[in-house]
Amino acid sequence: LELQPSGGVSPGGWYTEILAPYLMNNGLLIAAHFNPKESKWRSNMRKKFEKRIQDYPYFRKIKMSVLSMPPIKLTSDNSVDMVLTFRNLHNWLKSGYLEEVFQVSYNALKVGGIFGVVEHRAPKTFSIEEMIKSGYVSESYVIEVAKKVGFKLIERSEINANPLDDKEHENGVWTLLPTLKLNDAGLRKKYIDIGESDRMTMKFIKNK
């Protein structure tokens, strides 16, 4: 189950393009996308993603679900092997629903199921307010919330790390690729050279 595969970039589904072909003949990918009954922007994002399902052969077996705000049941309890989220945590933190999203993810997983997280990584010193403003979230905070709902951290990786990202950007993580929200166009090359954000990659388990 992939949470909000839009990734904030219309029509979304970058990671879905990896997951869907992999699971097409031996598994099922559930995409928990925006609620079509919410804002026009969210509804349009979902419609564009649904159109991709029709247009892209590897997407056609994807089952659609809803990740609404506040979060609702994603699918049947104790029914999926894995829940994945890519660069969404800062949005849920800003909306005030981060813990609830973790809880419905926990509920959806079978015992022994995996919760995988990729997120822009904040320095340990960042406050909640700094995380919300910058779009970066600290590993310690993610672990704290995950443990609170019942998850256990079992592994982390530096595969998505970027030591060039010092996290000190005027427009937060959105200053970097792929957004490049710049107040000074002369800084474009500087931020292209930095690349995308430094990211945590963590693996949790539902062990009971």
Task: State the predicted function of each range.
Residues 69, 91-104:
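A short, conserved alpha-helix within the catalytic core of class I
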Residues 166-208:
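Core SAM-dependent methyltransferase catalytic element
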Residues 28-32, 112-120:
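Conserved beta-strand signature within the Rossmann-like core of class I S-adenosyl-L-methionine
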Residues 42-72:
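S-adenosyl-L-methionine
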Residues 72-83:
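A short acidic, Gly/Pro-enriched loop at the edge of an enzyme's catalytic core
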